[in-house]
Amino acid sequence: GIVSTVNNGVRSDVYSKSVRTDSALGQALGAEALDPTESTNFSLGLTYSPFKNFNLAVDAYRIELKDRIASTAGLTGTGINNILAANGFSNVNYVTYYANLFDTETNGVDVVADYTQQLNKYGRIRWSLGFNWNETDITAIADNPSQLDGINIDRITHRTKGMITDADPK
């Protein structure tokens, strides 16, 4: 992809590349074939109707993911530039690839309440209120490949972790 920015009136293009794990460039960056993500889900749900036209539902859940697939951080620097150039990509500023980077655990609660108000000849109104809370924690992080360790590049950064725990849908 290409991103253009203008700074002090000068246009600056940034070229990025997302590579396949089975490509020569992917292999040079330490990419490996992707394993399927495995999930285990535990949940408990309760419903309660304390009076006519009112319902309350509470669901609690835990989702454990093993070998979660995510994008690496944008890999850049002299060592990366050398790998890119050796594979015919001298005009690329940074590169990413997908990998089994994390094991995660998500815990959450959903609460839904609804009440149906009868308006006689005018019909009815159904009032509904919902609440959700969830939190994702990283329980394991994949090792950095030796190809990147050798040039002091980490494929997982604080931002990469934040995309999993705070930004991605849970």
Regions found by a protein language model. Give the residues of each.
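Outer-membrane beta-barrel signature, preferentially recognizing the C-terminal barrel domain
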Residues: G1-A57, E64, F89-V109, D114-Q118, ...
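Gram-negative outer-membrane beta-barrel transporters
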Residues: A57-K170
